[in-house]
């Protein structure tokens, strides 16, 4: 069993040349895998940069999507998918709810370095700052300090 991780843009057939050195030696067709990845990521992750893990066993590839925190935050904004080729460096101006942030922190929990869910939420809020969106209409930095002050309670489950 071999695992290969690849960064792709959801719903797009990446050029086979970037996949070839990684999966060519395993006896798989890079072009076919590229199309499979595009099909797998089209409906949920269109236009978002995500990591895809290929688990290769007996020349069969299983595709699993590993979304980054940023991809999850952008997905929670529920913005319409934009054409990546036309618009570069998109600023996300929408607002995410605090319950969305807690939900994302739960999803990211196994890969997070945080001790508890509250700190996991602060990690995601930091990502929200980088994405450029607001949380319940407020700046994510203010929400982080509100969590530190105890003004916002985060359930430990």
UniProtKB/Swiss-Prot annotation:
The yes or no answer to whether the keyword Endoplasmic reticulum is present is no
Q: Which InterPro entries match?
A: Ribosomal_uL11, Ribosomal_uL11_C, Ribosomal_uL11_C_sf, Ribosomal_uL11_CS, Ribosomal_uL11_N, Ribosomal_uL11_N_sf
Give the keywords, sorted: Ribonucleoprotein, Ribosomal protein
Pfam families, per this entry? Ribosomal_L11 (PF00298), Ribosomal_L11_N (PF03946)
Q: Name one GO cellular component term.
A: ribonucleoprotein complex
A single Gene Ontology molecular function, please? structural constituent of ribosome
Q: Which SUPFAM superfamilies match?
A: Ribosomal L11/L12e N-terminal domain, Ribosomal protein L11, C-terminal domain
Q: Does the keyword Ribonucleoprotein apply?
A: yes
In terms of superkingdom, the source organism counts as Eukaryota
Can you cite a GO biological process for this protein? translation
The free-text function statement in the UniProt record for this protein reads: This protein binds directly to 26S ribosomal RNA.
What is the similarity comment for this entry? Belongs to the universal ribosomal protein uL11 family.
Q: Give the matching HAMAP family.
A: Ribosomal_uL11 (MF_00736)
Question: In its UniProt entry, what is this protein called?
Answer: Large ribosomal subunit protein uL11
